[in-house]
């Protein structure tokens, strides 16, 4: 009887440790987000250019460096076509399901 209780206690301890260990692993499927470089628009500021120039052993004056202003952001497109990246939330109870599209507008 003693060995059965010892095995049961060991089994519960292993189960508890596995539960704690695997608690951090979550299987989550989600929509990947597109990362755009909207912080600096692809242009470097003068401090970054000075650091790059000093790194390359170039002598650059602040006054000699002329930067053009960044181009204006493009206007948002108003396309009516469907794309694979379109996202339209549905009301509860009216989900189209996998492989089906919303055709009843």
UniProtKB/Swiss-Prot annotation:
Against InterPro entries, the record matches this protein to: CEP (IPR033250)
* Secretion signal span: 1-30
Q: In which tissues is it expressed?
A: Mostly expressed in roots, and, at lower levels, in stems, leaves and flowers. Present in lateral root primordia (especially in vasculature and in the basal meristem). Predominantly expressed in the phloem pole-associated pericycle (PPP) cells, and, to a lower extent, in the adjacent phloem. Observed in lateral roots (especially in vasculature), root-hypocotyl junction, leaves, inflorescence stems and flowers.
One GO molecular-function entry: hormone activity
Give the record's PTM text.
The mature small signaling peptide is generated by proteolytic processing of the longer precursor.
Q: Which residues carry this modification: Hydroxyproline?
A: 89, 92, 96
Cellular component annotations (GO), alphabetically ordered: apoplast
Keyword entries, A-Z = Apoplast, Developmental protein, Hormone, Hydroxylation, Secreted, Signal
Can you give the propeptide residue ranges? 31-85, 101-105
Q: Where is the composition biased (Pro residues)?
A: 68-77
Induction record: Induced by gibberellic acid (GA) and phosphorus (P), but repressed by brassinosteroids (BR), salicylic acid (SA) and nitrogen (N). Repressed by auxin (e.g. IAA and NAA). Accumulates in roots in response to nitrate, nitrogen and ammonium chloride NH(4)Cl depletion. Induced in shoots by osmotic stress (e.g. mannitol).
The entry summarizes the disruption phenotype as follows: Increased plant height with abnormal shoot gravitropic responses. Longer primary root length and increased number of lateral roots initiation and primordia.
Region annotation (Disordered) maps to 61-105
Q: Name one GO biological process term.
A: response to ammonium ion
**Family membership noted in the UniProt record:** Belongs to the C-terminally encoded plant signaling peptide (CEP) family.
Give the protein's function: Extracellular signaling peptide that represses plant growth rate. Regulates shoot gravitropic responses. Represses primary root length and lateral root initiation, probably by repressing the CEP receptor CEPR1. Regulates systemic nitrogen (N)-demand signaling. Mediates up-regulation of genes involved in N uptake and assimilation pathways.
Q: Describe, as the record does, how this protein assembles with itself and its partners.
A: Interacts with the CEP receptor CEPR1.
The name this protein carries in UniProt is: Precursor of CEP5
What is the native source organism of this protein? Arabidopsis thaliana (Mouse-ear cress)
- Encoding gene, per UniProt annotation: CEP5
């Amino acid at each position: 009887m003693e060995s059965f209780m010892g095995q049961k206690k060991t089994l519960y301890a292993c189960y508890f440790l596995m539960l704690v260990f695997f608690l951090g692993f979550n299987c989550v499927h989600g929509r990947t987000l597109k990362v755009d470089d909207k912080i600096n628009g692809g242009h470097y500021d003068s401090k970054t250019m000075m650091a790059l120039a000093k790194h390359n052993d170039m002598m650059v004056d602040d006054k000699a460096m002329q930067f053009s202003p960044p181009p204006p952001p493009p206007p948002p497109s108003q396309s009516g076509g469907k794309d694979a990246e379109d996202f339209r939330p549905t009301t509860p109870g009216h989900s189209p399901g996998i492989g089906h599209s919303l055709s009843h507008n």
